[in-house]
Amino acid sequence: MIQTPVIVTFANQKGGVGKTTLCVTFANYLVAKGVRVVVIDCDFQHSIMKCRKSDIKKYGEEQLPYEVWSYEPNNKAEMTSLVEKLHNDPEIDVVLIDSPGSLKAEGLVPIFVNSDIIVVPFHYDLVTIPSTASFLLFLDRLRQAVGERMKAQLFIIPNLNDNRVGKRSELILWDNTRETFSNYGYVTGKIPRRADMERFSTIAALDMQYRYVSSVFDKIYFSIFGKVTPVREVKLTGIQLTDNLNPKIGKKKNREEGVTHIAMDEDGNEEEREAGGLSADTTDKEKTEYE
């Protein structure tokens, strides 16, 4: 369990790995757990802020689930001041930072050094793996340079995975990659490539996203709060409810009695999970895996 406010940074020097989508999806996941969230958009494209403005035009701003702030990460002093301010704000539980897909910005160093958790999404492909390995090596050298000041836990996420793609030699490389990356942090289960995982909203969550990310996000959530149950009771209303934005797929469920979701395990198999995150028949022994 980490003392809040907790800073979680989504980062990789390789673009196109789903970093921004995972950041927003995790924000929606945390809101459903009663967590007070602020999202800091430091990506050069500012996709999250653009999405928030679009969402406000579409849904209004009466019930925004969390604030989105936009910053340019080029100023080292400004970023240092920002993370210090966020770490001392009692009104915030978790800060999510979407960093740029580049290491050129000078303000990234104080962000990485002061993060409690760094989430590194990547693809199993011959272009992304070397770039991600280089980024992990950069973080490791930064940790050695600053010493105990950098305490970030690393969660390395194989994102947008397609089990149908890859020659036998490549699949062997994927396994070796997982083993190598585990020397730098915790390599989570795979998040599959699905259309729902390539779009996001800063106001309305997607039920279909939950099934793909819950097992991975539960691990990160547990590392922060030491449990998988909500930190506080929160009644989501209107657009904040996890109704699928696609009316052909979305299903309204009995929210007064709790919601049962379909989650994906590491092998891509589906299983029912209660709103708290664990499957209904999880044993005490299995629960210890979150520790």
Enumerate the predicted regions with their spans.
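Long, low-complexity, intrinsically disordered segments
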Residues: 256-291
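Structural beta-sheet core signal
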Residues: 39, 97, 120, 156-158
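Conserved beta-strand position immediately N-terminal to the Walker
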Residues: 8
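Inter-motif core of Ras-like GTPase G domains
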Residues: 107-126
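P-loop/Walker-type NTP enzyme "switch/lid" segment
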Residues: 2, 11-13, 17, 28-102, ...
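Beta-strand-loop-alpha "switch" segments that mediate conformational coupling across diverse proteins
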Residues: 160-207
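Hydrophobic positions on the alpha1 helix immediately C-terminal to the Walker A/P-loop
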Residues: 22
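Conserved C-terminal guanine-recognition region of P-loop GTPase G domains, centered on the G4
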Residues: 132-145
